[in-house]
Design a protein with these regions (language model features):
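Buried hydrophobic positions in well-ordered alpha/beta secondary-structure cores of metabolic enzymes
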Residues: 24, 65, 83, 98, ...
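Conserved PLP-anchoring active-site segment centered on the Schiff-base-forming lysine
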Residues: 90-107, 126
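Active-site core of PLP-dependent enzymes with the aminotransferase class I/II
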Residues: 151-173, 180
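N-terminal "arm"/small-domain region of PLP-dependent enzymes with the aminotransferase-like
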Residues: 1-55, 63-64
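Short, small-residue-enriched loops and turns at beta-alpha junctions
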Residues: 106, 131-132, 150-155
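Hydrophobic beta-strand scaffold residues
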Residues: 123, 174-175
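Short acidic/histidine-rich motifs immediately flanking catalytic phosphotransfer sites
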Residues: 93, 138-145
Length: 180
């Protein structure tokens, strides 16, 4: 559960801290993730391989981000495309349709064009960034709208309120990459 009584600056500094009980260090220590033993068999559940999101630093960072966003949990990824592809694929299945804005990061566009067909996922790109262009692309099997604001690479701004309103009226989700 997130402690909402702490101020933002306190959360930035202290949330998710790793207590150094051995040496009483004040700052959370860094745990390198380069070499760890593999505990097989019964010990695998108790001591999972740290390279798979189990180092104390990864837990520290995810707890801090969750607290700063007033969320229960947060996931961290090694790259933006890992975050984008995981987020999209976790919310679609074969036969679903997603709408993407025309001005979209090239890596995301490439992912869509090379991977969606393998899984039977349909997609379309809007012909503009006006909210009406998003409405025009909605089909019976549309499950979501994916947008960037500002867009990459042209830094165009989309009307998040209007697009999310359209999505809500049709009971479809919106996903927003606001990296910039």
């Amino acid at each position: 559960m997130v402690n909402k009584s702490k101020k933002f600056s306190t959360k930035c500094v202290h949330e998710g801290e790793i207590k150094d009980t051995m040496y009483q260090g004040i700052v959370s220590p860094l745990f390198m993730s380069t070499t760890y033993p593999w505990y097989g068999g019964e010990d695998a559940e108790k001591k999972p391989y740290p390279r798979y999101f189990n180092t104390p630093n990864q837990e520290f960072l995810s707890k801090k981000i969750a607290a700063l966003e007033n969320g229960e949990k947060a996931l961290i990824f090694s790259s933006g495309m890992a975050a984008i592809s995981t987020s999209i694929m976790a919310n679609v299945k074969s036969g679903d349709h997603i709408i993407f804005q025309e001005d979209l990061y090239g890596g995301t566009r490439n992912f869509i064009k090379t991977e969606f067909g393998k899984y039977g996922i349909e997609y379309s790109f809007t012909k503009g960034l006006d909210s009406n262009h998003f409405s025009d692309e909605i089909k019976d099997n549309t499950v979501g709208i994916y947008i960037e604001s500002p867009s990459n690479p042209l830094l165009k701004i989309v009307d998040l309120k209007a697009i999310s309103s359209i999505a809500n009226q049709k009971s479809i989700w919106t996903m927003i990459d606001n990296t910039f």
